[in-house]
Amino acid sequence: KNREISLPVGTYNMIYWGTPKYEEPIYSNPVVVDPQITIGGDLSQQYFGLRKVSADTTYYPVFDLVYTVKPAHIGTEELSAAMQRVVAGLKVIVKNKNNGILSSSIAGMEVHVGGIAEKLNMYTAAPVNQTKTVSFPLVLSADGTQMSNATVMLFPSSAKPMFKLIIKLKNGNTKVYQQPLD
C-alpha cells in the first residue's frame, strides 16, 4: 500500500530504486542487506549489500535492481524517471556434448562467481569491494539432459571475474572447472 508524504515546495534530488517486471523466470531466492535509512541520515554513506551464505564463505544472488537520481521540483512537476539496471544477469546451462542424458553419477552442481561487489552505494549505485564470491545451485531438467538455473542477478564485478563450476559426484568426489569470464 502506498502512503502519502508531504514535502515543502522546492527542488529535491530524488533517489529511485526498484525491481523491473520479469519476462522470464529468475532465481527464486534473491536477498540483499538493506540500507539503514534514518531521519537526517547521510544516504551517501548507506549501502545495499550481499547476504552471506551461513554454511560457507560465499554470498547469495541479489534482486534485479534498477536505479537513478533525478532532480525534481516538488509542487510543480510529476515524479517520474527513467531507471538503469545496476546488476548483471547470469544464466548457466550444462549439457553433454551429444545433448544426451547427463551421467547418473552426478549428485549436483553449483556455480561460484568471484570478483563480485560486496555492496552498492545507496546514493550513487557505485560498487564497493569487488572481491566477494556469489554461489547458486544448478537444477537437473525433467528429461535429465541438462542442469541449469533461472537467471541470477549479481552486483557488478571486477574485470574478468572467475567462473567456477563445481560438480559433486555421488561417490563423494568433487570436480571443479574454472575460467575467467569476459
Please annotate each region the language model reported.
Residues 82-97:
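A short, Gly/Thr-enriched small/hydrophobic beta-strand-prone motif that recurs across taxa
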Residues 1-31, 102-182:
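Tryptophan-paired
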Residues 1-86:
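Short, low-hydrophobicity acidic/polar segments
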Residues 79-80, 99-102:
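Short helix-to-loop capping/linker segments positioned immediately adjacent to catalytic or ligand/cofactor-binding
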Residues 78, 89, 108:
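A residue-level signal for beta-strand positions that form part of recognition/binding surfaces
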